[in-house]
Regions:
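Active-site/ligand-binding-proximal alpha/beta "capping" segment
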Residues: 88-125, 132, 180
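A charged, well-structured terminal subsegment
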Residues: 93-96, 154-180
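Acidic/glycine-enriched connector segments
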Residues: 42-103
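Short glycine-rich anion-binding loops that position phosphate/pyrophosphate groups of nucleotides
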Residues: 8-11, 64-66, 106-109
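Glycine-rich beta-alpha loop segments
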Residues: 1-59
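Short, conserved catalytic or adaptor-binding loops enriched in Gly and charged residues
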Residues: 73-77, 151-156
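Glycine-rich, charge-decorated loop segments at or immediately adjacent to ligand/cofactor-binding or catalytic sites
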Residues: 42-50, 139-150
Length: 180
């Protein structure tokens, strides 16, 4: 199965977020999943690296707009690069190409990825699939959002999100969701 991993480009190898992503990539590859990432550095690189080092297949979805903006190229662990012209096309590819998505801590881009996928699930624009958010920041952030804006989010729409704290818990939750 193809699993997209969303996450930040900022974490360095010595940081916890990078190590969590590395572990996540390893676990996913050992379970036989193809890992799809945004293809660049930080947790995208770490998940790609973990998967590649564990013998898995890694697809990196890069973007010409981002490459022009930051002069970036795909990380060394990407086995197959899918370069899209625009950020919108990249986001659509990351979401449309997977059967599940896992989100590590991140910034505006990661938040956009999570919200876009969540909304597509809500309006049934994509087939049902797990969306698992890793790390306490996601639960805190979205609980705060729901406390302030919850009247605009139906209870049935909240069921698309799953919250876990670790890479291991994410893999277990993914397995559980796939069996149901």
């Amino acid at each position: 199965m193809r699993v997209t991993v969303f996450g930040s480009a900022m974490p360095k190898p010595e940081e916890t977020a990078y190590q969590t992503a590395l572990t996540l990539g390893q676990i996913l590859a050992k379970e036989g999943h193809t890992v799809i990432t945004g293809g660049y550095g930080g947790t995208m690189e770490a998940a790609s690296r973990g998967a590649a080092e564990a013998g898995g297949y890694v697809i990196g979805v890069t973007c010409a707009e981002i490459a022009r903006w930051r002069k970036l190229s795909a990380n060394a662990w990407v086995k197959e690069e899918w370069c899209r012209q625009t950020l919108h096309e990249r986001l659509s590819t990351l979401i449309d190409s997977c059967q599940a998505a896992l989100a590590l801590p991140g910034g505006v881009g990661t938040l956009l990825e999570v919200c876009m996928m969540w909304n597509l699930l809500v309006i049934k624009a994509i087939s049902p699939r797990p969306l698992i958010l890793i790390g306490p920041g996601w639960k805190t952030t979205l609980q705060s959002f729901l406390e302030e804006q919850g009247q605009y989010v139906l209870e049935e729409d909240r069921q698309w999100l799953s919250f876990v704290d670790t890479a291991e818990e994410a893999a277990a939750k993914l397995h559980q969701k796939l069996i149901l």
